[in-house]
Amino acid sequence: MTVSLPQKTTASIRWLAAPTSWTWVEQANARPMEVLIDHAHCERKAAGSAVQMMFRYLCEPGLGEALSPLAREELEHFEQVLGLIKSRGRYLEPLPSPGYAAKLARHIRKGEPQRMLDSFLVAGLIEARSHERMALLAEHSPDSELRSLYGDLLASEARHFGLYWVLVEERFSRAVLIERLQTLALAEVAALQGVLDCPEIVRMHSCGVCPV
């Protein structure tokens, strides 16, 4: 498998080794509020991850200036999604995690600078998958309000995984990046393989990808 190389200024979902399956789209459309609430949790966690990396690499030149605005934007998205949830008579209830991010985290190496490289690439892959699935919902959701919401968020999500690519490209050789991205992209697909046992537990990052 060969992962297409993102451009420095215009990354794309070519980060991903396999596309989302139509089964996931159908499951997500059947349980729109569960996916929406999970999406709010995803935005909250993405903000937390950006802040965590900003403080972990506090003295790394340029990281604070890049990650602080990203974290703020993730929180703005969280508030936007939360507002829609509340307008529909629901609240930010706890939801069981599909384990997607935890599976990816196991592939992050412990020593530096490998830990930094893996952390940024994993964060970028998660953003890329979010972008891809939001694009599917923006096109195929039967709910016009949800189509509008997901469509509005697409440009920001693309910027986010593009930013993570730029951050690693500034710090590592291209050959090292591509080799590691290929490995982690396959791990990302493996984290989404399988069949959802219960349609009620569909999440933004629940299983549902096409074969590699």
Where are these regions (language model features)?
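Non-heme di-metal
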Residues: 2-212
